[in-house]
Amino acid sequence: MILEKCGIIFLMEKIVITATAESIEQVEQLLEAGVDRIYVGEKDFGLRLPTTFSYDQLREIAKLVHDAGKELLVAVNALMHQDMMDRIKPFLDFLEEIKTDYITIGDAGVFYVVNRDGYSFKTIYDASTMVTSSRQINFWGQKAGASEAVLAREIPSAELFKMPEILEIPAEVLVYGASVIHHSKRPLLQNYYNFTHIDDEKT
């Protein structure tokens, strides 16, 4: 089994291991290995995932996870444009239907909809490189009702170890797997290649 990404939650009574899955078979393997939370998503609203799943697959994964007594975490952490916000409620309704335990959120608009409509799943603040201080995390916990937060990968260990003294909600740290460039929808790499002509034939 190849593990794509794994995180741990601290400031809790015990360490919680969260892992992404790239197939239903890998979900089963991760559950057998003792992972506490399975992290998955679909193509429109989830970012930084090894693969995406259809609604039917998410339903199947939810059953597997809950039958094993574990928790399902679904990515809703995209930066939402207006057309995406217009489509978000049916997806959140679906997540409620399959009894999703947690969702990750990176956009304030999604927090607003979740709180307005009273969904039962818990929310985790996940804005990637933006999550760099304990007071910022506490703000999202107090004002938006986030139950946890995902810390930026760039935080130095010296700062990281001081955070629990101030944090009011648990935080997740990436312990294994690839990191990312934060979502912007700007074609940065292609612009770089075009500027440097890096793809041109060289003799």
Label the model's feature ranges:
Residues 13-131, 150-203:
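Active-site pocket-lining/capping segments in soluble small-molecule metabolic enzymes
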Residues 1-4, 8-9:
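Short, positively charged and aromatic/hydrophobic N-terminal segments
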Residues 134-135:
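Conserved nucleotide-cofactor-binding alpha/beta core module
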Residues 143-148:
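A cross-taxonomic marker for long C-terminal extensions/tails that follow the last structured domain
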